[in-house]
Amino acid sequence: MGKKKKGCLRRIGCIAIVVLTPVACIAAWVFLSWPDVSALARENPQTTAFIEAAKTNGDRVEWSWVPYDRISIEVKKAVVAAEDMSFFSHNGFDTHELKIVARDAVKGKKVRGASTITQQLAKNLWLSPSRSPLRKVREALLTWQVEQSLSKQRILELYLNVAQFGPETYGVGEAAGRYFGVPAGVLSADQAAQLAAGLTRPSSWHPGVSSRGYSAAVARIQDRVSRCDWLDKLL
């Protein structure tokens, strides 16, 4: 083999090393830091990424866990109606909502959120608030894995127990006690709508707040729930 050809091969080899080494490092990092999603089928999380971020910021965290069968069906209906009407029919991603978001973006309209309950759960449990491309890839992969590993009821139980329902307040059990002085299992339809309405803005929207926007959100959820009798069979 001539010197010229050997030199060319060496250069190709060097380029390959330069290109592949970062890829290998990223792959190793992803593999080593990847959570055991399937474990959530048999055990509850001890903390979440969002809770740890709040603690890092010096925020107080009040959090308690309530099993699925001890959570009022009114809360389950209100949260599904407010956050993800297609929860029981999609595989983690609501393609219909994504199409609407894409259409509105093209038209220059205000873009609404299109995250499903499963996506929100993945973000709450494992991801930072960052919107980097790598984080979005991790979110998509984790969302898919959650849907493959857990039942819809378990996904909803996890979400209701890790979501933020107000300042320093995590989980529906903590929210029920703080705002209404009752266990999560006896929350009424009206109380459930008030809790669900604050999920998009937990720092500023929660029971007891005087806000036109919050009151309108509560009313919208109550209207949706009144037209969702079919949810009773799935919850």
Q: What residue ranges belong to the model's regions?
A:
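Juxtamembrane regions of bacterial inner-membrane/periplasmic proteins
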Residues: 2-235
